[in-house]
């Protein structure tokens, strides 16, 4: 993943932050431009406090099921955007949503749904 805005007009690209417990290949496109920092800590509160001391005022988290669940359980999320592909995950795919881990269990409600080509985009907001 490149994790940038791919549009045909000038735009401020997001700063990139990698949260990982593993070694990572530094030759990936992800690291080529506007790279900010790598955090190997598991302490989300410490990481977010560190980011709050910079010019970052909001973050977009693109994560797998474990990290996404960590953000939700710590109540660091106010909006969830889910893209559902029409393609199957395959044998080794990890599904995040199941009955015990439904997004509604974290206090979110579905606000809108959009069809984008063959995919579905759903936006959930914190139900306060």
Per-range role (PLM):
Residues 1-128:
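Enzymes that bind and transform nitrogen-containing heteroaromatic metabolites
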């Amino acid at each position: 993943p490149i994790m940038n805005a791919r549009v045909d007009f000038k735009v401020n690209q997001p700063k990139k932050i990698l949260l990982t417990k593993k070694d990572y290949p530094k030759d990936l496109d992800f690291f080529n431009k506007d790279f900010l920092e790598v955090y190997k800590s598991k302490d989300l509160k410490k990481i977010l406090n560190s980011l709050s001391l910079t010019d970052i005022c909001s973050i977009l988290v693109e994560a797998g099921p474990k990290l996404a669940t960590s953000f939700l359980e710590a109540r660091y999320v106010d909006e969830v955007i889910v893209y559902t592909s029409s393609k199957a995950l395959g044998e080794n795919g990890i599904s995040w949503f199941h009955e015990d881990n439904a997004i509604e269990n974290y206090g979110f409600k579905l606000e809108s749904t959009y069809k984008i080509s063959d995919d579905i985009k759903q936006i959930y907001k914190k139900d306060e």
